[in-house]
Amino acid sequence: MYLNTISPSRGSKHLSKRVGRGIGSGLGKTGGRGHKGQKSRSGGKVRLGFEGGQTPLYRRLPKFGFISRKAMVTQEIRLSDLSRVSDKVIDLNVLKTYNIISRKIKFVKIIMSGEIKRPITIRKLRVSKGARAAIQSIGGQIEE
């Protein structure tokens, strides 16, 4: 066997159909598109959700819900995330400087997930009941 004799196995490669190249090819003239109509034209596609002029499903159903603007600037952080902070007092700006939260976040709630090893002081952040108990049990404080 030589490199110049290697070829793909029979039937593993499909040749692309050459359309519009004469009657004998079987794909001449209309090129497999049929006669007339929107789909036979160049660029002839119907938009997504179009139902032929019938009121489409997305307009037949009522509107619902909304996107809370406050949710975009609110974040929950785990108790274990606070172990990355070396400061004794933790507030919103400290969390931003340690890249625990992004700059756009304005409201933070600390939730009970993971554990914390050293006493810390939480200032002006919301804290869940479980996280509050965990922080206070090791001698930490929560200032409102």
Curated annotation (Swiss-Prot):
Q: Name one GO biological process term.
A: translation
- Coiled-coil residues are none
| Secretion signal, residue range per the UniProt entry | none
One MF term from GO for this chain?
Answer: rRNA binding
What UniProt keywords apply to this chain's record, in alphabetical order?
Ribonucleoprotein, Ribosomal protein, RNA-binding, rRNA-binding
List the residue ranges of the region (Disordered). 1-51
- Annotated membrane-spanning segments are none
Q: Which GO terms describe its cellular component?
A: cytosolic large ribosomal subunit
- Basic residues: compositionally biased ranges: 11-20, 32-44
Ranges of biased composition (kind: Polar residues): 1-10
Functional summary from the UniProt entry: Binds to the 23S rRNA.
Q: How does it assemble?
A: Part of the 50S ribosomal subunit.
* Protein name, as recorded: Large ribosomal subunit protein uL15
